[in-house]
Structures are given as structure tokens and as C-alpha cells.
Design a protein with these regions (language model features):
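Solvent-exposed, non-transmembrane regions of membrane-associated and secreted proteins
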Residues: 16-264, 289-304
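Alpha-helical transmembrane segments
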Residues: 273-287
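Acidic/Ser-Thr/Pro-Gly-rich, low-complexity N-terminal segments
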Residues: 1-20, 297-317
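Alpha-helical transmembrane anchor segments
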Residues: 259-272, 282, 295-305, 309-311, ...
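Core hydrophobic alpha-helical membrane-spanning segments
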Residues: 33-36, 270-277
Length: 317
């Protein structure tokens, strides 16, 4: 009788211990699944937002194509006349100064090259940049794409023009100009504006202080476009300037769009995959462990039954 009571108590302790292990495994599994979600959600959101910006840029190009040729030519002509009226230079830094948005001059600016509130489209195929360009560098403009720096030439090209485009880096769910640091001399910048495609080849890359504006001034006889963003990441004490000079558009320019992929995305997906592989390994390991425990408990129960049978035989004897 004493042996039977001892065996029963031992079995209950074993079952209680197994139950606690299962609860711990369930909690840790939930935590690991949450970790996968935490790592993957920013990647998915960024990818979706990037594709949405690409869609807006594509929609702009389609809207321009639907305009009558005379209307497109009129937009280009008015933009060139606007550039001829520009002073030598406008605002020195898009993040430090802002224009009087209520002025007549600014309202005239907003009416230039305006197709569904979008001015143009910029592509840098080598690093996957494909973004709509908006008028000015307001918070709203820079939250949705690239801003054209008011006071610099409109994006219609021509000798003595220098257009400046700005965008953020380090946004939580948008790539924007994050990959501008990977652009190299010789890469191409394509501007799609009012039905024309202007090609620029990167010839100068520089980091400057916000007050150093001489490198974004126009030069006689030159046709430039400069892409600007804050650097270094997280500190934003300087500006990265990537300048391109106008070229005849070569046939080999890449046009196919690829959603930009960054190192942090690769790391996040890699960590999530490792966690998933660990969960799968542990699931198989737990199944084997549970199977061994069930077999052990079955043997113990069989041993108890045999022991009880022997005890009954002795008592009858």
C-alpha cells in the first residue's frame, strides 16, 4: 500500500512538472512570435510605403501623358520663362529657412508644372530611388516625397540652371533618400517633367554644413540638378549633396524599378528567420521530448500495475 501511494505521488509530481514546462514553453513561444512581428512589421510597412510612392510617381507620368501636347508645351514654356526671372539664388537651406507661402511670388511658383499637385518625378535607378517631386520643402511635401527647393530653377533644364531637390533620410517606414549615400560618380539621375525626360550624370558628391550654399548656386553655361539630404544618420549636422550634370539620355539607362532594400531590412528579416527556425527546431525537439515522457510514464504505469498484481498475489498466498 505504501509503495502504491508513493508511486502515485511521484507520478502526480511528474505530471505537474510537465505541465509547468509546457506553460513555460507556451509563454516563450508567444514572446518569440511577438519578436518576429516586431522585426517584420517595419520591413513590411516600409516596403508598402515605398511601393505607394512608386505608384504615385507612375500615376503622375500617366497623367502627364494624357495631357494634350499643346498643354505640355505650354507648361514647359512658362517654366522656362519663370527660370529666366529667377534671381541668382533663393533659400540657402530647406531645413532652416522657409519662404512666405502666402506671397504672390510663391503662389505663382505653385502654379508652375503642377499636375495633380505633383511637379515632376525623379529616378536614380542605381539605388532604387523613384519618387514624386512636390513644390517646396514643407513638412507635408517632405513627408510624401521629394521637395523642390523654392528659389532654385524649375526642372526644365537649360544652360545656367541649377535645380535642387531635397528629401529626408531615416524615416521610420519610408526609404526616401536613405540610399543616396550609395550613389557614385557616373550614376544617372532622370527627371520626368511635363512629358520630357532629362538625364543627368553624377559628377560631384560632397558633404557640407547647412550654411555652405555655394555648391548649389547656378553656373554659367552649366545645367545641373542636385539631390540633398541630411547626414550623418541620426545627427543631421551636415548636408549630403549629389550633383548631376545634364547629358543626352543614353540608351543604356536602367528604367526598371526595384523597391529599395536596405541593410537594416536584411538584418531584421534575417533575425526573424533565425527565430522562426529556432521555433521549428524547438517544436520538433519538444515533440520528441513529450513522446519520451509519455513512453516513460506508460512504463511507470505498467510497472505500477505489475507491482499491484504481484502484491495481490502475495496477499492471496
Amino acid at each position: 500500500m505504501a509503495n502504491r501511494t508513493h508511486d502515485t505521488a511521484q507520478r502526480r509530481r511528474s505530471e505537474h512538472s510537465s505541465s509547468r514546462r509546457r506553460r513555460r514553453r507556451s509563454r516563450s513561444t508567444i514572446y518569440l512570435i511577438l519578436a518576429i512581428v516586431v522585426f517584420l512589421v517595419p520591413v513590411v510597412l516600409t516596403h508598402l510605403q515605398n511601393n505607394e510612392q512608386h505608384r504615385v510617381a507612375e500615376e503622375f507620368s500617366r497623367s502627364v501623358e494624357q495631357l494634350a501636347p499643346d498643354e505640355r508645351n505650354g507648361m514647359l514654356e512658362r517654366a522656362r520663362e519663370y527660370n529666366d526671372r529667377l534671381p541668382e539664388f533663393g533659400a540657402p537651406d530647406p531645413w532652416m529657412y522657409g519662404p512666405d507661402t502666402n506671397s504672390e511670388a510663391y503662389q505663382d511658383y505653385l502654379n508652375q508644372l503642377n499636375v495633380n499637385s505633383v511637379m515632376a518625378r525623379v529616378q536614380v535607378p542605381s539605388v532604387g530611388i523613384d519618387l514624386p517631386i512636390y513644390h517646396g520643402t514643407s513638412t507635408s511635401a517632405l513627408a510624401h516625397g521629394v521637395g523642390h527647393l523654392y528659389g532654385t530653377a524649375l526642372l526644365v533644364g537649360g544652360e545656367g540652371t541649377h535645380s535642387v531637390l531635397t528629401a529626408h533620410t531615416g524615416m521610420s517606414t519610408l526609404t526616401m533618400f536613405d540610399n543616396l549615400t550609395h550613389v557614385k560618380k557616373g550614376d544617372d539621375i532622370i527627371i520626368d517633367v511635363a512629358g520630357e525626360k532629362l538625364a543627368y550624370r553624377v559628377d560631384h558628391i560632397q558633404k557640407v554644413l547647412p550654411t555652405q550654399v555655394e555648391n548649389i548656386r547656378p553656373e554659367v553655361g552649366k545645367d545641373y540638378v542636385t539631390l540633398v539630404t541630411c547626414t550623418p544618420y541620426g545627427f543631421n549636422t551636415h548636408r549630403l549633396l549629389v550633383r548631376g550634370e545634364r547629358i543626352d539620355e543614353p540608351e543604356h539607362i536602367q528604367r526598371e524599378y526595384h523597391s529599395p532594400w536596405q541593410l537594416w531590412m536584411t538584418l531584421a528579416v534575417g533575425i526573424a528567420v533565425l527565430i522562426l527556425l529556432y521555433l521549428l527546431w524547438r517544436w520538433f525537439a519538444d515533440r520528441r521530448r513529450d513522446k519520451r515522457e509519455r513512453e516513460r510514464e506508460a512504463r511507470e504505469r505498467q510497472h505500477e500495475r505489475e507491482a499491484r498484481g504481484e502484491n495481490r498475489g502475495e496477499n492471496h498466498g
